[in-house]
Amino acid sequence: MTDGGMTKDAIGAGALAGEGLRAFFERDAITVARDLLGCHLTVDGAGGRITETEAYFPDDEASHSFRGPTKRNGAMFGRPGNVYIYRIYGMYWCLNFVCHPGSAVLIRALEPETGIAAMMERRGTDMLTALCSGPGKLCQALGIDIEINDRLLDLPPYALTPSTPVPIVAGKRIGITRNAEAPWRFGIQGSRYLSKPFR
């Protein structure tokens, strides 16, 4: 049973689509961030198991949605299960999944499982644990950029398959200065595929 009162079996065993996708994401971002851990994400067939996430809310000063909709963050106010992609430092893309409008989950890391050769080529490394160990690295490995922003996760090139529950650790979010004490970063306990260890 998830924190939102819904079993993952009830959501469906295959890739999330249609009403199943909406039901999974139309919950608070903390619940979704926890339930995304262990889920299998692919982009054009390359991907793996999500190992680390962060939750963001409209009333959260660290969130892009805090000051309301803009041209840049419009996708964050889309339907549950919508993809919101943005760039940091003028270089690195970051992948987020929308929950309630203005709430989203940042995908920080995953454990590579499929399309590994393509990911290694994009990243320029054969170190498996370093392929997707951070939001920018993850997007580079999966070939994610603004061209596949603002579309639902049941549309190509995305596929997201639910998982059975996994052991979870929580801690402070990374790289923010506002609302920095909120323990809204989540990871699979014991995973080697994280952006940074939990302390």
From Swiss-Prot:
Cited NCBIfam families: 3mg, PRK00802.1-3
Pfam families tied to this protein: Pur_DNA_glyco
Family as reported in the entry's similarity comment: Belongs to the DNA glycosylase MPG family.
GO biological process, one term: base-excision repair
Keywords from the UniProt entry: DNA damage, DNA repair, Hydrolase
Organism, as annotated: Rhizobium etli (strain ATCC 51251 / DSM 11541 / JCM 21823 / NBRC 15573 / CFN 42)
Matches recorded under InterPro entries: Formyl_transferase-like_C_sf, MPG, MPG_sf
GO terms of molecular function: alkylbase DNA N-glycosylase activity; DNA binding
Enzyme Commission code(s) on record: 3.2.2.-
Name of the molecule in the record: Putative 3-methyladenine DNA glycosylase
